[in-house]
């Protein structure tokens, strides 16, 4: 008994001393770090993140607050989980958090961070961003390729119409990936990259999903650099293998495009424009590697994030048929039943837009923003944030915060139809709803993403009635974590045409 009491006393002294020293260490010249879980030696809070880090971090935020600090491996990480906290980092201190931390995804998938997403904030990043906005992603550029979207959507409608006649189910993600990759291919390369659905497009879809999933993993080597060479999770091996596949595909596209340049005289596409303007006034020149990395960004993010949002929206409407019927009723009243939805109709469809916003809120394409890192130490809400601290904004948690949203777990588009919420815009200025991020490093494809989701979702809802296959009793709404938030079980549906047969075709 004496020994046990001595051990207990020793343990108590050790714990008290440990807590006291830890508290002292968290204060630097009177500057206190944000609160957060203590974790373990060396590995820190890594085990606490689990398979669904956005969910785990949201639960921690309820205990530790809107701004919390974790030691993840040997790296410090600060997490913002409310609109005000996100605004402090992404607006007030935007410039200080304008860079990305080094990570395996940037190294092995993005050509050593030679792309636009992971590039250092500087002249090369600005040139990549400028060319992308000017020739593909900006407002004027989007108008210029509106016919491409409409025509490719016609191909998708015809395919779905044929499947409905044959009694075949539609695998939504596959259909969307096929259409979006072809839209982007026509803008970038002047060609549909997939002529027929089949093995090739399914392999491309699997590659995109794998990239967005593996790039979102919390890789041990990123947080404990001395262990990176061991690749304990096998993540880096998978990234290298996947990169070889993408590089082969991009190299083939690049070479075929170069060989057919004579066909585009006077009608340059995106890649032609980038090649023509690869130098800037500051002496920066985009290499072939930079351009291939940019194409990788555009093809992967351009297909996966938008298709995920549309798939989630359709799943929510099939789970809540009254919402689907209300959306169709609005479209029937505004558009009628004799033609397809046009992009110019969308401003007159407030309920459709509310559905899209509600999807962005409840199922943000990126649950955790792509990480940033502090260039210098700073103070946020009275807390000291050291230099080289990684920043993660929990967009998923903000969208489900009961302090911000009434009944946040309910899919209720009507919340965006009246009052203050009706003015909320998802383009980065209203921090209650930032599905594309905010600040300098906001997703370059924000405008395109919103246009694609509203237009394609609206067209699918207006053109077809939707129901689950007969053997599906209850729709699975579980998530699969990654850079993009996928449905764990892909949505499959039976569709029935609602419009005249001539609507289901490409443009004449």
Swiss-Prot record:
Superkingdom of source: Eukaryota
One GO process term, biological-process aspect: anthocyanin-containing compound biosynthetic process
Tissue: Flowers.
Principal cellular location given in the protein's record: other
Residues that bind heme: 443
Compartments reported by the entry: Microsome; Endoplasmic reticulum
Alphabetically ordered keywords of this record: Endoplasmic reticulum, Heme, Iron, Metal-binding, Microsome, Monooxygenase, NADP, Oxidoreductase
Broad enzyme group: oxidoreductase
Record field: catalytic activity: a 3',5'-unsubstituted flavanone + 2 reduced [NADPH--hemoprotein reductase] + 2 O2 = a 3',5'-dihydroxyflavanone + 2 oxidized [NADPH--hemoprotein reductase] + 2 H2O + 2 H(+)
Pfam families assigned: p450
Known function: Catalyzes the 3'5'-hydroxylation of naringenin and eriodictyol to form 5,7,3,'4',5'-pentahydroxyflavanone and 3',5'-hydroxylation of dihydrokaempferol and dihydroquercetin to form dihydromyricetin.
Family: Belongs to the cytochrome P450 family.
Protein's name in the database: Flavonoid 3',5'-hydroxylase 2
Organism of provenance: Petunia hybrida
């Amino acid at each position: 008994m004496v020994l046990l009491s001595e051990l207990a006393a020793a343990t108590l002294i050790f714990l008290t001393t440990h807590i006291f020293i830890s508290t002292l260490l968290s204060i630097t010249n009177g500057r206190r770090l944000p609160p957060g879980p203590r974790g373990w030696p060396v590995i820190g809070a890594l085990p606490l993140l689990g398979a669904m880090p956005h969910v785990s971090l949201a639960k921690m935020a309820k205990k530790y607050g809107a701004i919390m600090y974790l030691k993840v491996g040997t790296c410090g990480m600060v997490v913002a989980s409310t609109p005000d906290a996100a605004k402090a980092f992404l607006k007030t201190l935007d410039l200080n958090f304008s860079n990305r931390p080094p990570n395996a995804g940037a190294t092995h998938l993005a050509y050593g961070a030679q792309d636009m997403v992971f590039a250092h904030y500087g002249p090369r990043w600005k040139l990549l961003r400028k060319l992308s906005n000017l020739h593909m992603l900006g407002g004027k550029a989007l108008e210029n390729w509106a016919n491409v979207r409409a025509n490719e959507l016609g191909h998708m409608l015809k395919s779905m119409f044929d499947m409905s006649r044959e009694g075949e189910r539609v695998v939504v993600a596959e259909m969307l990936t096929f259409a979006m990759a072809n839209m982007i291919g026509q803008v970038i390369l002047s060609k549909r990259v997939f002529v027929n659905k089949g093995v090739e497009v399914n392999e491309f879809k699997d590659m995109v999903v794998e990239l967005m999933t593996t790039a979102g993993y919390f890789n041990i080597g990123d947080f404990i650099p001395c262990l990176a060479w061991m690749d304990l999770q096998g993540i880096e091996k998978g990234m290298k293998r996947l990169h070889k596949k993408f590089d082969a595909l991009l190299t083939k596209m690049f070479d075929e495009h170069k060989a057919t340049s004579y066909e585009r005289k006077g009608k340059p596409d995106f890649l032609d424009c980038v090649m023509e303007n690869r130098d800037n006034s500051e002496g920066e020149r985009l290499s072939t590697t930079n351009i291939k990395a940019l194409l990788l960004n555009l093809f992967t993010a351009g297909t996966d994030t938008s298709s995920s949002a549309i798939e989630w929206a359709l799943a929510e409407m099939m789970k809540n048929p009254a919402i689907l019927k209300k959306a169709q009723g609005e479209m029937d009243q505004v558009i009628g039943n004799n033609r397809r939805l046009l992009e110019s109709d969308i401003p007159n469809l407030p309920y459709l837009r509310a559905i899209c916003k509600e999807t962005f809120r409840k199922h943000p394409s990126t649950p955790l923003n792509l990480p940033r890192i502090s260039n210098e130490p700073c103070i946020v809400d009275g807390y000291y944030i050291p230099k080289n601290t990684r920043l993660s904004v929990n967009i998923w948690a903000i969208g489900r915060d009961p302090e911000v949203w009434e009944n946040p777990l309910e899919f209720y588009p009507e919340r965006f139809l009246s009052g203050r919420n009706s003015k909320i815009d998802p383009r980065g200025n209203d921090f209650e709803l930032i599905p594309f991020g905010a600040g300098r490093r906001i997703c370059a494809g924000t405008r395109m993403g919103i246009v694609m989701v509203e237009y394609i979702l609206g067209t699918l809802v207006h053109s077809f009635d939707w129901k689950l296959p007969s053997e599906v009793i209850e729709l699975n709404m579980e998530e699969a974590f990654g850079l993009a938030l996928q449905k764990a079980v892909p949505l499959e549906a039976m569709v029935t045409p609602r419009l005249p047969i001539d609507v289901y075709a490409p443009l004449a």
